[in-house]
């Protein structure tokens, strides 16, 4: 009987899941869209798709080598931005999640199909694990199935799950953690809990943090269910027991978790604090939209997503009006979750104290689904009080939605909310009819009717959320078959086809997606990874270039020849009609000193004649303290003349320059200190002198946006608004200044910006137009014109090239070359600094300095020096040993546990 019920439960869930997927995602099918989020924001393509395609390829390569008898584990890849550790960078997206091993069976070209399938598979598994948990808690079969469908087909999956596939993982793991906790309390085997902790830790430490918090809360609540005597002693013993199992699970995952955490601790994305005023309360619109979209189809903001099926509205109202003691506990859990969602401080705490964000809302989905599984059978035996209360609640909710939508505020208009209100009313009326007829959940007509209503509900949700006539969410996703082709466009193919055996970097100017290097195996100067080394972030920020939008999102170096050459950028493609802002395209900026190789359509390939090898030497140095006092141009010119070190070198023969020694930089302050964009005028013009033989830049110091002064009512409703930035136009070249306000969750402390002006013009003066993309006031401390003689830049580059390494070889974890030293110097190796690199010179271990902000410096003594650098992921070896011991410990524990258990059974 139990086996038949289990089969029926999983069978009905599977059938309903397939049918609901078809109707919910119908707009994706009719519009020819994939689930790769990349047509609007690039996260889905640049981060997830490219990482998973790369991971699949890496898995196949690893096993090919293993079967061939020469196993090789590549730990570093130069195509990850400027170069980065593979495990610590890609654990956030791919490595560690057991499900992602399936990508090893598909080629990069077919990754999109697997990508779409994996999102649906994760959703399906989330429902399965919920059913396993609910059955353990003795919930009735059909209520459990509906609860699982409510859990899966919610706003969290439809929005965050489609954008970031691994965001669905905690929905799989949390029911397993709760199941494991129940098993431990019931003195059953602890393996479910241990393995759930292990897999959570391997998959993603970010969600492990949240899962740990909610698992502790769950275990604390359930403790009082299982313990009636000696509560204090048992509480301490329970902490000890769970702590032991949790630690064992963490230790089993240490081989992946430890390197990933080390990488996170060296991350440059966070660390600039948060505006405490933003943690007090959300803008007024958030609360209005939260109520509307609890069963609606829109979004609230701060990554808060509810969007539950309409039946949830009835379940919640039923719970609120129920007087049963058991239901009071459910009600308390639900209300506590709602309170946490309406106060930013909880989003801040649950998001690792970085900024207020409610990605933890999957826990609310779990609570709501559990409420549904528990309450559904009781909806057929409602008391008069409950019937009246639920009916009144539906009417009040509907009237509220009508009033809010009729307010005239565009941001509050909710497409389809009346359809949602209508559906909740239909559910309610149907339940009343069934109750009047004496039907319960066992009646076939009840099950069929509810199944049809659920299909209609999710179909309506899919229509309004995804369809172009609704919120048009599908327009943010890429067309089917487009993802791989986009990463192989003409400018990228031209760079890939360059026949040059040397080690170098490339840059695709005007190409929108940052992580194109990963699956094309190109060394680039662009990157967009949530885990980016702090030294890389800080160095690029110090350049004051416009290509850096966020701390972890950077693109090129504004075609500044010095920076390009210092980074070893040898080949460049320029798109002569690229998009820089909405409905705004730009002709490409071609740096001086490059040689045109060929052209295809609007894409031209150039060779940088002044590109330096991956290692070059200096006679003198400057300290980082001196370096940080300079603006972006000063830093660039300083690196052309002397190496920048994080500490004084041991070799006293290396000259320390007290003053910057480089090209002659001229700075002229302009009189403006404030630029406004009053009504009717959205731009300002600045005329600047330019000289053909000089690099010319416009430097904004402490540029901030004060925003548009709204009335108090408007401010309360919308909160503070940031700016879309400033579009800088000179002739046919467009550049964009990305300005972030302190209340922006991605603010990283940037206020200085440098705009490259002299685009090989012959005019004596140039007009620069600043187009303000958002109304308001833009203020800065100083605006300066900076010029640098081109001949001085070229002379310094020539000097660096004359003092460069020969016979350079790079492959995976190894870099080597030969340098002929005429006198003591410091070699700069343009690979990002990491403690995982170890250097030897002529076979002797040598100290590595952090050089030029993010690269590595090695002291070279006079003579011919053979340099070798080898890389090992920090924490990998010790993590592997910890995991090995933990797995052995689990085996020993398992044998002991089974032996002890059998002994107890025999005694009984």
Cite the ranges covered by each PLM segment.
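Contiguous transmembrane helix-bundle modules in multi-pass membrane proteins
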Residues: 188, 207, 329-345, 349-484, ...
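Periplasmic/ER-lumenal interhelical loops and adjacent helix-loop junctions
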Residues: 42-58, 62-65, 98, 238-239, ...
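Membrane-interface coil-to-helix junctions
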Residues: 20-130, 149-171, 264-269, 276-305, ...
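Membrane-embedded helix bundles of polyisoprenyl
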Residues: 17, 123-136, 142-226, 238-266, ...
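Active-site-proximal, structured, solvent-exposed surfaces of multi-pass membrane proteins
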Residues: 2-6, 657-908
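Extracytoplasmic/lumenal acceptor-recognition loop(s) of multi-pass membrane glycoenzymes
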Residues: 77-84, 88-92, 453-482, 494-567, ...
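Transmembrane alpha-helical segments
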Residues: 126-133, 173-185, 213-221, 314-318, ...
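Membrane-interface micro-motifs in multi-pass membrane enzymes
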Residues: 88-93, 113-125, 150-178, 185, ...
């Amino acid at each position: 009987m139990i086996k038949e019920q289990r089969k029926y439960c999983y069978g009905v869930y599977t059938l309903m899941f397939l049918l609901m997927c078809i109707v919910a995602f119908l707009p994706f099918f009719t519009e020819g869209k994939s689930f790769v989020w990349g047509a609007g924001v690039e996260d889905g393509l640049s981060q997830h798709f490219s990482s998973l395609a790369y991971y699949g390829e890496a898995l196949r390569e690893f096993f090919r080598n293993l079967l061939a008898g020469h196993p090789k584990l590549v730990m570093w890849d130069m195509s990850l931005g400027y170069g980065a550790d593979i495990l610590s960078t890609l654990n956030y997206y791919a490595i560690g999640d057991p499900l992602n091993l399936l990508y090893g069976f598909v080629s990069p070209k077919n990754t999109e199909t697997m990508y779409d399938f994996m999102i649906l598979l994760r959703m399906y598994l989330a429902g399965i694990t919920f059913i396993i948990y609910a059955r353990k808690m003795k919930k009735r079969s059909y209520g459990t199935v509906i609860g699982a469908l409510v859990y899966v087909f919610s706003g969290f999956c439809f929005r965050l799950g489609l954008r970031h596939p691994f965001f669905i993982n905690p929905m799989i793991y949390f029911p397993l953690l709760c199941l494991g906790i129940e098993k431990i309390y019931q003195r059953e085997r602890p393996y479910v809990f241990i393995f759930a902790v292990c897999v959570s830790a391997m998959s993603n430490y970010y969600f492990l943090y949240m899962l740990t918090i909610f698992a502790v809360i769950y275990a604390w609540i359930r403790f009082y269910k299982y313990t009636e005597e000696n509560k204090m002693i048992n509480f301490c013993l329970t902490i000890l027991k769970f702590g032991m199992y949790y630690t064992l699970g963490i230790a089993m995952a240490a081989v992946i978790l430890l390197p990933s955490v080390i990488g996170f601790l060296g991350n440059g994305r966070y660390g600039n604090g948060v505006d405490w005023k933003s943690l007090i309360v959300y803008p007024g619109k958030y609360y209005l939209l939260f109520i509307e979209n609890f069963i609606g189809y829109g979004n609230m903001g701060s990554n808060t997503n509810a969007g539950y099926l309409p039946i949830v509205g009835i379940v919640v109202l039923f719970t609120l009006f129920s007087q049963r003691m058991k239901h009071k506990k459910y009600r308390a859990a639900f209300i506590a979750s709602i309170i946490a969602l309406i106060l930013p401080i909880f989003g801040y705490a649950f998001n690792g104290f970085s900024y207020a964000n409610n990605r933890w809302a999957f826990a609310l989905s779990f609570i709501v689904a559990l409420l549904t599984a528990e309450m559904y059978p009781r909806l057929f035996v409602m008391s008069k009080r409950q019937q009246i209360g639920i009916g009144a609640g539906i009417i009040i909710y509907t009237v509220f939605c009508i009033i809010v939508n009729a307010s005239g505020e565009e941001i509050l208009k909710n497409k389809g909310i009346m359809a949602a209100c209508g559906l909740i009313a239909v559910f309610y009326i149907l339940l009343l009819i069934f109750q009047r007829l004496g039907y319960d959940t066992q009646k076939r007509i009840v099950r069929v009717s509810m199944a049809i209503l659920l299909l209609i509900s999710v179909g309506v949700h899919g229509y309004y959320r995804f369809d172009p006539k609704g919120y048009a969410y599908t327009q943010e996703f890429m067309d089917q078959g487009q993802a791989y082709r986009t990463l192989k466009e003409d400018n990228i193919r031209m760079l890939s086809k360059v026949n040059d055996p040397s080690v170098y970097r490339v840059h695709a100017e005007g190409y929108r997606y940052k992580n194109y290097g990963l699956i094309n195996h190109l060394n680039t100067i662009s990157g967009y990874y949530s885990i980016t080394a702090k030294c890389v972030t800080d160095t690029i920020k110090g350049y004051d270039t416009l290509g850096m939008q966020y701390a972890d999102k950077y693109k090129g170096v504004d075609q500044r020849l010095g920076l390009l050459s210092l980074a070893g950028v040898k080949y460049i493609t320029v798109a002569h009609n690229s998009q820089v802002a909405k409905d705004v395209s730009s002709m490409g900026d071609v740096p001086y000193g490059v040689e045109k190789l060929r052209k295809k359509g609007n894409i031209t390939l150039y060779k940088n004649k002044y590109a330096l090898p991956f290692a070059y030497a200096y006679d003198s140095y400057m300290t980082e303290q001196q370096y940080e006092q300079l603006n972006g141009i000063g830093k660039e010119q300083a690196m052309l003349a002397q190496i920048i070190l994080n500490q004084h070198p041991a070799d006293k023969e290396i000259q320390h320059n007290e003053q910057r020694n480089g090209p002659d930089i001229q700075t002229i302050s302009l009189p403006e200190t404030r630029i406004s964009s009053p009504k009717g005028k959205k731009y300002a013009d600045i005329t600047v002198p330019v000289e053909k033989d000089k690099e010319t830049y416009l430097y904004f110091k402490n540029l901030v946006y004060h925003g548009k002064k709204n009335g108090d009512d408007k401010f309360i409703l919308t909160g503070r608004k940031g700016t879309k930035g400033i579009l800088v136009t000179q002739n046919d070249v467009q550049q964009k200044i990305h300005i972030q306000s302190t209340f922006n969750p991605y603010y990283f402390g940037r206020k200085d910006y440098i705009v490259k002006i002299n685009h090989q013009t012959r005019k004596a003066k140039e007009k620069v137009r600043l187009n303000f993309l958002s109304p308001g006031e833009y203020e800065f401390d100083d605006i300066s014109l900076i010029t640098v003689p081109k001949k001085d830049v070229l002379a310094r580059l020539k000097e660096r090239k004359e003092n460069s390494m020969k016979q350079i070889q790079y492959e995976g974890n190894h870099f080597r070359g030969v340098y002929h030293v005429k006198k003591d110097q410091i070699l700069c190796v343009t690979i990002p600094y990491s403690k995982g690199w170890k250097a030897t010179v002529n076979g002797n271990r040598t100290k590595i300095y952090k050089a030029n902000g993010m690269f590595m410096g090695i002291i070279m003594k006079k003579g011919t020096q053979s340099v070798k650098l080898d890389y090992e992921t920090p924490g990998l070896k010790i993590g592997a040993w910890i995991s090995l011991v933990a797995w052995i410990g689990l085996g020993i524990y398992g044998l002991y546990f089974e032996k002890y258990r059998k002994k107890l059974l025999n005694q009984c």
